[in-house]
Amino acid sequence: MATITFDSLNPVTVAISAGFLLLLIIFVKSRTGSSKRKPPGPPGWPIFGNMFDLGDLPHQTLYKLKSKYGPIVWLQLGSINTMVVQNAVSAAELFKKHDVPFCDRKVPDTLTAFNFNQGSLGMNTYGGHWRVLRRLCSMEFLVNKRMNETTDLRRRIEDNMVRWIEEDSLASKAQGGTGAVQLSRFLFLMAFNLVGNLMLSRDLMDNKDPEGREFFDCMNEILELAGTPNIADFLPLLKKLDPLGMKKRMVDNMSRTMKISSKFVQERLDNRKAGKINEKKDFLDVMLEYQGDGKDGPDKFTEQHVNIVIMEMFFAGSETTSISIEWGFTELLRNPHAFKKVREEIDRVVGVNRMVEETDMENLPYLQAVVKETLRLHPALPMLLPRNTMEDTEYMGYLIPKGTQVFVNAWAIGRDPEYWQDPLSFKPERFINSSVEYKGQHFELIPFGSGRRICVGFPLAHRVVHLTLATLVQAFDWDLGAGVKPQDIDLEERLGLTLRKKNPLNVIPKKRVHI
């Protein structure tokens, strides 16, 4: 009988075995001790826990688990303690009474490339640097006065989108096609150019700007990587190995993106030295001019900080906004009675001799209801961004250990039959004469989150989603294609960094308002 000695073992085998043994010890420890005071949840596998139990659409799986385990569900994702909040009462408790201890972020490994998380607003540790960025965004960039100054800019970019849609449809017909356009592409380009103008005062998707197109391509790669599940996030011992190569790919794409954004920054610095100052400040100006007081946060932003914020604003502002618009327009096409009501309201208030403006929105209550209903059913971030507990915390009768990852399932909360009648149906009328808003104070509707880390960009998203939906309804009649009925339009989801339509909306536009 052969004798197995330690010397006969392959070093790699030994390392892997030791690693799995350590993970097993961590898993067993996580299942003992104070487990009686943790929320209920499904049993998991050794080492991996519930990693493979949630499927491709975890927000839907967790929604179904609520009936068995209640509104607070405990998961073990590899070695990561995870809590999921799934109703308005528990969300209110978290945001109103425990916002600070739950205010940190759990950061995916890919977003630590170039220390992205340390310069980011959305993924930064709760502290001085985050507070400075938050203050600059909310008081210097996204305050009403600033946004009112860029109203004409947004209308121009919307008009460009209308022109692109019409030109693409005509080109399709000229080549023997149906004239159908993939709407999501134009919505993303519109949002991308909008962020480009607000951040850098330039159209990045101009045909004369090849660097803008390369920047666009890199940003799409970053979005895909940031939204792809990574085993290293659940088994942190694997982070240095980067087993799926995702960190390396993220470094490559961020490197290319930063080289381009550095050119934009240097160009601005050169112009400022030459006395060429923008008449209206964009966010790059705000960041370059920032001087801290040395008490809270940095005294000034480094070039890397500036580049990180530029990247973040593009993928946060472009992706979430365009997705929300596509979901809203999909629901309008699936529900012709709702489309008709929006069209009639716009024609009554605006007419057909000019395009709808942001100032018209207060007189379009049904459109406002459509946006609320869209965000209720289709939040762009279905479980918001992951939080991280900064200390052991007593919450809803449970002891939540420090370092626990916390998700709030806004998708499930928006479909909770305890708060919403006929919750799975698209009924904008439910918001007519209703005081419920999505500004973080009504916890049955929190697509942008709540508390200190509520999405800082929601005031801008609010304006753009309303204006774009109104523009699409006003500017075009829409044909679904031969034999396609409204009820044939599917609502299948695909989850990456955000919740997209699995099958992009393809429709045939016919110009209605010629202005």
Curated annotation (Swiss-Prot):
Heme binds at C455. GO terms for cellular component: endoplasmic reticulum; endoplasmic reticulum membrane. It is an enzyme of class 1 (oxidoreductase). Disulfide bonds: none annotated. Induction: By jasmonic acid (MeJA). GO terms for biological process: indole alkaloid metabolic process; response to jasmonic acid. Expressed in the leaf internal phloem-associated parenchyma (IPAP) inside the mesophyll. Signal peptide: none annotated. Pathway: Alkaloid biosynthesis. The chain crosses the membrane at residues 8-28, 180-200. It is found in: Endoplasmic reticulum membrane. It holds the Pfam family p450. Its EC number is 1.14.14.161. It is a multi-pass membrane protein. It catalyses: (+)-cis-trans-nepetalactol + 3 reduced [NADPH--hemoprotein reductase] + 3 O2 = 7-deoxyloganetate + 3 oxidized [NADPH--hemoprotein reductase] + 4 H2O + 4 H(+). Keywords: Alkaloid metabolism, Endoplasmic reticulum, Heme, Iron, Membrane, Metal-binding, Monooxygenase, Oxidoreductase, Transmembrane, Transmembrane helix. Component of the seco-iridoid and derivatives monoterpenoid indole alkaloids (MIAs, e.g. vincristine, quinine, and strychnine) biosynthesis pathway. Catalyzes the conversion of cis-trans-nepetalactol (iridodial) into 7-deoxyloganetic acid. Also converts iridotrial into 7-deoxyloganetic acid. This is Iridoid oxidase. It comes from Catharanthus roseus (Madagascar periwinkle). The gene is IO.
